[in-house]
Amino acid sequence: MSETTLILAIESSCDETSVSIIENGKNILSNIVLSQIESHKRFGGVVPEVASRHHVEGITTTIDEALNSANTTMNDIDAVAVTQGPGLIGALLVGINAAKALAFAYDKPLIPVHHIAGHVYANHLEKPLQFPLIALIVSGGHTELVYMKNHLSFEVIGETRDDAVGEAYDKVARTIGLSYPGGPQVDNLAAHGEDSYDFPRVWLDKNSYDFSFSGLKSAVINKLHNLRQKGEAINEANVATSFQNSVVEVLVGKTIAACKNYNVNQLIVAGGVASNKGLRAHLSSACESNDINLSIPSPKLCTDNAAMIGAAGYYLFKAGVTADMALNGYNHMDIEQCSIES
């Protein structure tokens, strides 16, 4: 293995086609992202078949662009990393098959990467991970608290018992009447409202780090339905603020409690919802008050991208994790199954 390790990484788990060249797990030489938001906006959400077709159309040119932007060739690449799951199976297979083709044609190791592990390692691209740490994972499909003793060590200490936080945001956004993608729209609207609606904060058991957002989601939907039935005025900004404050209060409260209990050196935030301005502000304030070292990636690294897959892929490569040409994609994958004890 050369002193400088270059990873070509591919991410296609949902509605972004992305290819990145990462040096030594931390330096981004290129990170090309093709977004499909405009294509899915008219449907009000991601349509799996449409997503897969866009990946097929864009994957080859995205690979070429990533290599050209990094001023490198496949001969310089040490390994090919690709998202194995979780995600939309058709979308995943486009990236996996492209990665297999490159690995086979150029005789490079093939590295399977868990999508959420990638989100965790997005932090490492801007600020070194400091173990032990707690990772708050917040996305459209995941809400988890993960304890990490060291690189590639994942222990889930809390998770949602029903809806993921991003799922709740999207449903509330649609009920308010906001366009896709709903999460950022709610966040932007919440900045202009007041916490005037009494929505529940679901804490569950006293010592539990688990989450539940289905009750809150239903409370918001029912409140809006009842107000509309009565013909009463709805302050949409206040609804957004009240909903977001309910979400953020629970997320921050449980996360800070976990950090104290596990005596960690760092709190990192991972996933698309990590770009939420309200969450970032509340976490920053809480961590400052409790003397907790906080790391949240830049918004461009919170959403799906291949740079994060390359960062995680580098450490998997160093640990000797590779796959053969039988590599498959999966809708659901437990991050603990990807844990490597060093």
Curated annotation (Swiss-Prot):
Its main location: cytoplasm. The gene is tsaD. It is an enzyme of class 2 (transferase). PROSITE patterns: GLYCOPROTEASE (PS01016). One of its GO terms (biological process) is tRNA threonylcarbamoyladenosine modification. CDD domains: ASKHA_NBD_TsaD_bac (cd24133). This is tRNA N6-adenosine threonylcarbamoyltransferase. Keywords: Acyltransferase, Cytoplasm, Iron, Metal-binding, Transferase, tRNA processing.
